[in-house]
A protein has these predicted regions:
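Histidine-acidic metal/acid-base catalytic patches
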Residues: 1-29, 34-36, 68, 109, ...
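N-terminal small/glycine-rich loop or linker at the start of catalytic domains
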Residues: 1-4, 75-85, 238-239
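Short, well-structured secondary-structure segments
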Residues: 28-34, 73-78, 113-115
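Glycine-rich, proline-tolerant flexible connector loops at the mouths of alpha/beta enzymes
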Residues: 33-62, 123
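Conserved radical SAM core fold
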Residues: 34-41, 83, 120-122, 157-159, ...
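Short secondary-structure transition/capping segments
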Residues: 41-45, 87-89, 125-127, 163-165, ...
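Active-site acidic/histidine proton-transfer and metal-coordination neighborhood
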Residues: 62, 66-73, 83-190, 200
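Short, well-ordered beta-to-alpha junction loops that form the rim of enzyme active sites
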Residues: 79, 116-118, 153-155, 195, ...
């Protein structure tokens, strides 16, 4: 396994600075954020360490030289919008930018693009399904044609009132994954698995490692702390951030020893990338860098 981090937590740093920090800390790889340049739509979005618009082979070669000089690799390219938003104009922009990521990944010889399926949060899964097929069948075929695998993160994208009532990502649970992969059985369609979401959803985060072993292309290492006393007060219908807190790996409720024990048993040899969303470490660049250093020390015991 390779240990890396998601570059979104270092938005003010250049690609060269991110690579240098990763190398100095001892990371093996980085998932590079590729949002379109412009105002961020939400926290951790809007970060552009690789601008994939009109991306040339010359640009790709420069990036590859940069990461090679640092002695690391690119685990994947990341972009996490809502391709199934009911706003047709926005949805078209998101899908087109995903195609740009796929083409950039091909030029970079990076075989994974990580993203969300998306969702119209006001509609049921069944009501979203036709849009899912319309948007994602051609996207997965486009990725396959260019030798790229798509890793869908299992975050429900339901944290606050503006994402009520159902969140903005269909692909949050195994039942939906089964249905997705039956609908689009392409070997280029899989998961970017984050166990932390299953903690606050109160689901088994180990079983999917086995059940979907052949579909797990990439892993995010994030932790959460569930506030049971608060959950007892507000119940599961409250907005989820009212009863759980994102934390660094090792500071929440994920049993990382068990997680890596099962993950390694499946034969997984891909990237495990730290995703920092812990507000206790976000105030300054130095604190965010320290959060990555701390996470590296903790997780390296499991990845070797």
């Amino acid at each position: 396994m390779k240990l890396g981090f998601v570059s979104a937590i270092l938005p003010e740093q250049t690609l060269a600075e991110v690579v240098g920090f990763a190398a100095d800390t001892g990371f093996d790889c980085v998932e590079l954020m590729c949002w379109p340049k412009g105002k961020a739509e939400r926290r951790y979005a809007g970060v552009t360490h690789v601008d994939v618009t009109d991306f040339s082979q010359t640009e790709a070669d420069e990036i590859l030289q940069c990461v090679s000089d640092g002695g690391i690799t690119i685990s994947g390219l990341g972009y996490y919008p809502n391709p199934l938003t009911p706003n047709a104009t926005e949805a078209a922009i998101y899908s087109e930018h995903l195609k740009n990521l796929i083409l950039a990944a091909e030029r970079l010889s990076v075989d994974i693009v990580n993203t969300f399926i998306g969702r119209d949060q006001t509609r049921t899964i069944d009501e979203n399904w036709e849009r899912f097929k319309q948007v994602w069948k051609p996207l997965i075929q486009f990725a396959a044609d260019h030798g790229i695998r798509i890793g869908i993160e299992n975050c429900p994208m339901f944290f606050t009132e503006d994402e009520w009532p159902a969140g903005q990502n269909l692909a949050y649970c195994p039942e939906v994954w089964e249905r997705m992969f039956e609908e689009i059985p392409s070997p280029n369609f899989g998961l970017n698995f984050d166990p932390s979401h299953f903690i606050w959803l109160q689901m088994d985060y180990l079983k999917p490692l086995v059940t979907f072993a052949d579909r797990i292309f990439h892993v995010h290492a994030k932790d959460v702390r569930l506030d049971r006393a608060k959950l007892d007060e507000v119940g599961i219908l409250a907005t989820p951030l009212s009863y759980h807190t994102p934390k660094l790996p090792g500071l929440g409720d994920v049993n990382w020893g068990s997680f890596f024990s099962v993950l390694s048993d499946t034969g997984y040899e891909g990237a495990v990338c730290v995703e920092v969303e812990d507000r206790a470490y976000e105030e300054t660049l130095e604190m965010r860098q320290r959060s990555l250093q701390q996470s590296h020390i903790f997780l390296r015991q499991f990845t070797g």
